Design a protein with these regions (language model features):
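C-terminal binding/interaction regions
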Residues: 3, 66-80
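Conserved alpha-helical segments that form or flank metal/cofactor-binding pockets of metalloenzymes
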Residues: 52
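An internal, amphipathic alpha-helical element
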Residues: 37-38, 69
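Acidic, glycine/proline-rich low-complexity segments that act as flexible tails and inter-domain linkers
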Residues: 1-37, 49, 58-63
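Short alpha-helical scaffolding segments that buttress acidic/His motifs in well-ordered protein cores
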Residues: 19, 39-46, 74-79
Length: 80
């Protein structure tokens, strides 16, 4: 986790808890499996130029069973 987020989490624990709850609820709601959700987040991170998010979501997508080819395609979708 980037140092800025670590400081934010320590300074505003209730806000961080609410954010984490929203994030988890959004991730768990609906029919998409974990791999698909993480591949979507890979594409979003690539589109926004968020290197930290890209690294984190690529790792999570791979752990959820995404192949390297699927991961690269998700990145390409974010670029296009």
């Amino acid at each position: 986790m980037p140092q800025t987020l670590t400081r934010f989490r320590k300074q505003f624990p209730e806000v961080w808890k609410a954010y984490a709850n929203l994030r988890d609820t959004c991730t768990d709601t609906g029919p998409l499996d974990e791999k698909t959700v993480e591949l979507i987040k890979v594409g979003i991170s690539a589109a926004l130029g968020r290197e930290g998010g890209l690294v984190a979501h690529v790792s999570r997508a791979r752990k959820a069973g995404a192949s390297p080819a699927e991961t690269y395609q998700a990145i390409l979708q974010g670029m296009g």
